[in-house]
Every structure is written in structure tokens, then in C-alpha cells.
Amino acid sequence: MKTLVLLSICALLSVCWSMGAVEPEVVVDTVADTTADAAPADPAAAAAPSSSSSESSESSESSESSESSESSESSESSESNSSSASDSNSSSDSSASDSNSSSDSSSSSSSSSSSSSSSSSSSESTESSESSESSSSSSSSSSSSSSSSSSSSSESSSSESNSADSSASDSPSSSSSSSSSSSSESASDEAAKVVVKRDLASVLLRRRRAAPGGDLTPLQLESLREVCELNIACDEMAETAGIVAAYVAYYGPVPF
């Protein structure tokens, strides 16, 4: 169904172009005509170009009016065809876009062929108008391309800013989690140190068989001092008397 509609639209457009319904508009450059009329110095030579320029202006005006009416009729017919095609194919967006692109390319080719055929018979004013039209179309295309590039650059910058914001929002959470974990680890280390100090004192006192009053022999004191110096947990209780006093104060007198 889509192919049939496309073929029918192409056939109608080709018939319209073959009949000469679509032709470019002719714009008369009055400034060029006045300069061309003022150039010759002889009155006879000036009269001949002026009459020819007036005839060319009249013919160009009549051709412009007829071509504008024909182009408006052809545009109305093409619009009606495109509207009927879009109504019949409301669900097929791709076919409509294909038909639009094909109609645009065919219209550009037909306009170029008709402009080439008319440029051979028209004057320099039509050529200047065609060049101005082509320059305006190129400027419009360049403006559209620049707008599209600016929109794409703005989208990329917004996406980059979003990613930067997300990374910035992620970094404080990671730093806070790392700080909380380090604080919990330090607290557990301190608790472990306290436990190690207490257990070490009790084990050493039991192994050395301290006296009931808590007094130790010089040999036992020396051995305890050496052990505490090697152990990192005995940083504040390097003295053996301090270890024994802490044990006695916490656990009471030594039971053995």
C-alpha cells in the first residue's frame, strides 16, 4: 500500500513537471535595468535599449505573474496530494518522510532544469536574482546547520555538567563512608588494646606465680618489662608495677 501511494504521487508530480506547471519565479532587477539604460551615450542607441528593456520588463512581469500563479496552483495540488497521502497513511511516518524527501529532490532537480532552460532566454537580471536566491538558500542552510551544531554542543555540555554533578555528589558520600569506617576501626582497635593489656597482665602474673600481695621478684619484673616493651599494646604501662597495680585494682588481689 505504501509503495502504491508513493508511485502515484511520483506519477502525478512527473506529469505536472512535464506540463511545465512548476517553474522558478523570475525577479526583475530594476537597478540593473536603469544602469543598462544610462550606459549608452547616443540617443538612438539609448532609445533602442530603453525600448528593449521596457519590453523585457513587461515580458518578465507577465511571465512572473503567470509563473507565480502556476507555481501556486502546483503547490496547492502537491499539498493536497501530500495531505491525502498523509491521511491515508497516518500510521506510516517513514513512508511519509520518504515521499517528502523524494518530492523535495525531484522538485529541486526540476527547478534546476527549468532554471537552466529559462536562463538561456532570460536577461542578466534573472541570473543575478537566481544567484541571490542561491546565496540566501545557502545562508539559510548554514544557519540551520549552525543552530543544530549549537544545540548538540549545548546538549553535550549539559550532559557533561550532569555527569560532573553526579560524580561530585558521589564523592562526599564515599568520603563520609570511608571516614565512618576508619573511625569505627580506630574505636575497635582501642577496645582491643585495652583487652590485650588486661589479659596480658593477668597471664603474666599467673605464669610467674606472683606473691599474694602482688610483689614480684626482680627476675619476674625484668621478664615482664621485656615482654611489655616488645608488645605494642603496653605503650602506657611499660612499667611492671603499673601493670600489677592495674590488675590488682581491677581484679583484686592475686588468688595464687
From Swiss-Prot:
Residue numbers bearing the 4-carboxyglutamate modification: E222, E226, E229, E236
The keyword Metal-binding is assigned to this record: yes
Localization: Secreted
Family: Belongs to the osteocalcin/matrix Gla protein family.
Binding positions for Ca(2+) 3 per the UniProt entry: E222
Ranges for region Disordered: 38-193
Entry-linked SMART domains: GLA
Annotated Gla domain residues: 218-252
MF-aspect GO terms: calcium ion binding; hormone activity; hydroxyapatite binding; structural constituent of bone
Protein residues bound to Ca(2+) 1: E229, D235
Keyword Signal annotated: yes
Signal sequence extent: 1-18
Cystines in this chain: C228-C234
PTM description: Gamma-carboxyglutamate residues are formed by vitamin K dependent carboxylation by GGCX. These residues are essential for the binding of calcium.
Protein name: Osteocalcin 2
Function: The carboxylated form is one of the main organic components of the bone matrix, which constitutes 1-2% of the total bone protein. The carboxylated form binds strongly to apatite and calcium.
GO cellular component: extracellular region
Annotated Ca(2+) 2 binding sites: E226, E229
Principal localisation: secreted
GO process annotations (BP): biomineral tissue development; bone development; cellular response to insulin stimulus; glucose homeostasis; negative regulation of bone development; osteoblast differentiation; regulation of cellular response to insulin stimulus; response to vitamin K
